[in-house]
Amino acid sequence: ENTAPTEIPVIKQNAYPYNYVTCSQAQTLASGMVKSENYTSSLMFGVQWDLVLKYLETKGTAQADLKTDSASIGNYYDNLWEITNENSKYAPNGSGWTSGARGKKELNTSILLSTGASETFSKQGIYDIAGNVSEWTLEYTSNSYYPCANRGGVYSNNGDVYPAADRDNGTTTFYGTIIGFRVSLF
């Protein structure tokens, strides 16, 4: 079942993650989000992602939580959490959205969440920098078959496999429930 969002992407709590996009679709969508001569919108550059992680570290997030195992700060397969946010949404195995608080998640289960479903997954007001969906960036890899780069981790994998600092790759045609994007304004 396709769980692609039907809402306009926004930066706020309890929104559907904008997933099911290829890296080029993500850049097209991101660059068209702001219609202004004063601002530009784009996918995040890899260095911007790294600077956000460094900022979070200077504000008290442990380096190990960002670089080694992000299960304690993000939505991952191998962690336990309890969502009490009545305005949140969730999709077991990334399919079939349900509105309302999910309650307790069992260990080793895959549940896609709306943005900021838990304050635990919000660091300095930045939602879901670790886990939930991996995010396309403007980086390119050295692998010609997998030229597109994405950052962060996914709800269906472990926090020590794909921590917040992870830099992964994908094909130009890859899309799915586990990949989305984050917009930067400058």
Where do the language-model regions lie?
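Short aromatic-cysteine micro-motif
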Residues: 1-128, 186
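Surface-exposed recognition segments
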Residues: 121, 129-186
